[in-house]
Structures are given as C-alpha cells and as structure tokens.
C-alpha cells in the first residue's frame, strides 16, 4: 500500500462525531440544570427568610420603636399604615421603649407627611407627644431608616424595634443593620395586605 501523505488525517467516523456532540450537549444541559436548581434553592431560602422574619415578634427592651411609613390621605393614615400604628399602640404600654420614631415624607401636593399623620394618630391613642420623634423626609424605606439612624445616633441610641407589615420586615431589618442600627422586628398581625396580595409581595421581597 502507498505510504500516507504527510498531513493527511483519517476522517473521524460520523458516529464518533455524533457521540462527541451528544456528550458536549449533555454536559451543557447538566450545567444549566445545576444552575437552575441552585438558583431556585437560593430563591426559596430567601423566601423562607422573608416568611419567618415576617412572623417574628421580638418585643424585648430597645431604645426606640420605629414604625415604617405608608400612604396617608390628607393627614389620615391609610388602612395599611393604621394597622402598623395600632400595633405600636399595643406595644407602647409594655414599656418596650421610651421613644417612638414615626417615618415617611410626602409627595408633591400633600399637606401632611406620613410621619405627621402617624404622630397625630398615635397621640390620639395615648402615646405622649414628647415620646414621638419625626422623620419627615424619607421617600423610600432606605431613606427613612437611614435618617432614623442619624436621629438616634445624635442621641447616642441604636437599638430599635421595627414595626411594619410581615412581607416588609426582613428588608427593613436588613436596611437598619446596614446603616448601623441594632434592629429587631415586630410585625403587625392585623395587616390589610392579605391573601393573594400578601403572597405576591412575599414572592417579590424574596
């Protein structure tokens, strides 16, 4: 037989090419599947944290109770905000803290801030005016909690109990910890965010 010409390469049988491509494709699919499983696992762990934190009721002694703002209508708290404030009214007689910080600014055209509406509501229900601190400028949870941290730091305080809706508890606590507060949460159990809307917001927070 003739000697092979240098550089000539025997063609790879079609079956072997197909097998190689099958193995490569299988590895790609396996890698994608692992990534999806890990991603879903991380998401469901986060969702569990949102759910568990939202059901916490850590009402030990702190420097201040911080109630997160929500919508108000010309000085009247929305049902969502009123539920949070009612929880503060329940906590106040327990002597958990000597101060309540009300939070939240307003939108253009509003005569009152969320903090002002909250303060009026609490004062009408027995929380002394001189126990109320106002954070009137925040338009997001982060802005409000950051401003609260500054207000309390000026008084040498940093331990807080955050009152909010269950779905909002974990995010509020994490923000508070990020800005230097020693934070715990006590979620309202009379939230008007229920059923499918509550589930949607829990999923969104995760």
Language-model-derived ranges and their functions:
Residues 3, 7, 47-200:
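A structural signal for short, hydrophobic/glycine-enriched beta-strand patches
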Residues 11, 15-57:
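N-terminal type II signal-anchor transmembrane helix
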Residues 202-206:
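Short, intrinsically disordered, charge-balanced linker/junction segments flanking boundaries
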């Amino acid at each position: 037989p003739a000697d092979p010409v240098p550089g000539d390469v025997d063609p790879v049988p079609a079956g072997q090419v197909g097998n190689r491509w099958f193995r490569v494709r299988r590895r790609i699919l396996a890698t994608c599947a692992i990534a999806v499983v890990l991603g879903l696992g991380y998401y469901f762990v986060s969702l569990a944290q949102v759910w568990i934190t939202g059901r916490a009721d850590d009402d030990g002694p702190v420097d201040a109770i911080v109630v997160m703002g929500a919508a108000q209508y010309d000085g009247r708290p929305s049902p969502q905000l009123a539920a949070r404030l009612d929880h503060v009214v329940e906590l106040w007689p327990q002597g958990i803290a000597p101060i309540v910080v009300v939070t939240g600014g307003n939108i253009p055209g509003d005569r009152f801030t969320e903090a002002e509406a909250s303060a009026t509501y609490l004062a009408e229900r027995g929380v002394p005016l001189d126990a109320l601190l106002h954070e009137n400028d925040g338009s997001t949870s982060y802005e409000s909690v950051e401003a609260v941290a500054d207000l309390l730091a000026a008084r040498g305080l940093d331990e807080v109990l955050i009152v909010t809706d269950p779905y909002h508890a974990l995010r509020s606590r994490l923000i508070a910890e990020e800005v230097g507060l020693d934070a715990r949460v006590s979620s309202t159990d009379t939230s008007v965010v229920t059923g499918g809307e509550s589930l949607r917001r829990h999923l969104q927070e995760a």
